UniProtKB/Swiss-Prot annotation:
Its main location: host cell. The lineage of its organism: Viruses, Riboviria, Orthornavirae, Pisuviricota, Pisoniviricetes. It is a multi-pass membrane protein. One of its GO terms (cellular component) is membrane. The keyword DNA-binding does not apply. Keywords: Host membrane, Membrane, Transmembrane, Transmembrane helix. This is Non-structural protein 3. Residues 34-124 form the CoV 3a-like viroporin TM domain. It comes from Porcine epidemic diarrhea virus (strain CV777) (PEDV). The chain crosses the membrane at residues 40-60, 69-88, 95-111. It is found in: Host membrane. Residues 128-203 form the CoV 3a-like viroporin CD domain. It comes from the Viruses.
Length: 224
């Protein structure tokens, strides 16, 4: 099963048993008819396991740059070491599915890497990235991005991005989506931290929602 979820299953067992006990042709055919349900269940199970493995492994995005490097090396190891081993052992279908899925995903991210002349698309294994002063991070597709930070720095992904002035500060979205999210507001919190609000849409109003700090006038009356 380790060297092929599709082909190294019941068929291999039937052939090995037939050769070892020297079964006649009629006995082999009868044995194959008896194991048809098991063969079908095994093939379906193998297909599901392989599909889940390929989908997860090809699209997985790590949470840090170092882990992304490890995952990239693992994908190359699967393509250049594991898949040839599958071909050598006769698991042609498994090797073809895994190899095509990983190479197809790699070609897709390589296209965006070539288009924007940036290898981070390949390392992050994504078709869309957000850039802030040369640093890159994943982009979730939202039109409003709120980042934490402080005076003259922003926490961007796993990096700290320092800046002198926030006048020209913006998020550059590149890849499958292209947009420039400009810095619209900077919100200073009581603990000294700041929230930086980036968006393409203009802010038309801000409402303070700290209701527990609002004092009501006991003598206020309602006039009709």
């Amino acid at each position: 099963m380790f060297l092929g979820l599709f082909q190294y299953t019941i068929d291999t067992v039937v052939k090995d048993v037939s050769k070892s006990v020297n079964l006649s042709l009629d006995a082999v055919q009868e044995l194959e008819l008896n194991v048809v349900p098991i063969r079908q269940a095994s093939n379906v199970t193998g297909f599901l396991f392989t599909s889940v493995f390929v989908y997860f492994f090809a699209l997985f995005k790590a949470s840090s740059l170092r882990r992304n490097y490890i995952m990239l090396a693992a994908r190359f190891a699967v393509v250049f070491l594991y898949c040839p081993l599958l071909y050598y052992c006769g698991a042609l279908l498994d090797a073809t599915i895994i190899c095509c899925a990983l190479i197809g995903r790699l070609c897709l991210v390589c296209f965006y890497s070539w288009r924007y002349k940036n290898a981070l698309f390949i390392i992050f294994n994504t078709t869309t990235l957000s850039f802030l002063n040369g640093k890159a991070a994943y982009y979730d597709g939202k039109s409003i991005v709120i980042l934490e930070g402080g005076d003259h720095y922003i926490t961007f992904g796993n990096s700290f991005v320092a800046f002198v002035s926030n006048i020209d500060l913006y998020l550059a979205i590149r890849g499958r989506q292209e947009a420039d999210l400009h810095l619209l507001r900077t919100v200073e919190l009581l603990d000294g931290k700041k929230l930086y609000v980036f968006s393409q849409h203009q802010i038309v109003g801000i409402t303070n929602a700290a209701f527990d700090s609002i004092q009501l006038d006991e003598y206020a009356t309602i006039s009709e």
